Amino acid sequence: MAAKIRRQDEVIVLAGKDQGKRGKVSQVLPTGKLIVEGLNLVKKHQKPNPQLGVAGGIVEQEAPIQASNVAIFNSATGKADRVGFRFEDGKKVRFFKSNSELVK
């Protein structure tokens, strides 16, 4: 099955502490989760490692978000949208269901 949300897609968060915020997908995990740039930030306590030159402290990093809690953002309508698939010229392409425009 093809992925409806892929890397570099702009998504909007539907549920959770970052609800309503938008960002680009930086990574799609095989567990059905996404990492979105600048969203779902958590604080991680980093242990210092002098061999690698890593300073210790509290570091903010992006945590995965469940794919069902985000939707692809349609810049033409300015809203969250659903994705469908169709064949054009023998290739499978993604399109927005609200206005039938191709994704990217």
From Swiss-Prot:
GO terms for biological process: translation. One of its GO terms (molecular function) is rRNA binding. SMART domains: KOW (SM00739). Keywords: Ribonucleoprotein, Ribosomal protein, RNA-binding, rRNA-binding. The keyword Ribosomal protein applies. The keyword Secreted does not apply. GO terms for cellular component: ribonucleoprotein complex; ribosome. It holds the Pfam family KOW. Part of the 50S ribosomal subunit. One of two assembly initiator proteins, it binds directly to the 5'-end of the 23S rRNA, where it nucleates assembly of the 50S subunit. One of the proteins that surrounds the polypeptide exit tunnel on the outside of the subunit. Belongs to the universal ribosomal protein uL24 family. This is Large ribosomal subunit protein uL24.
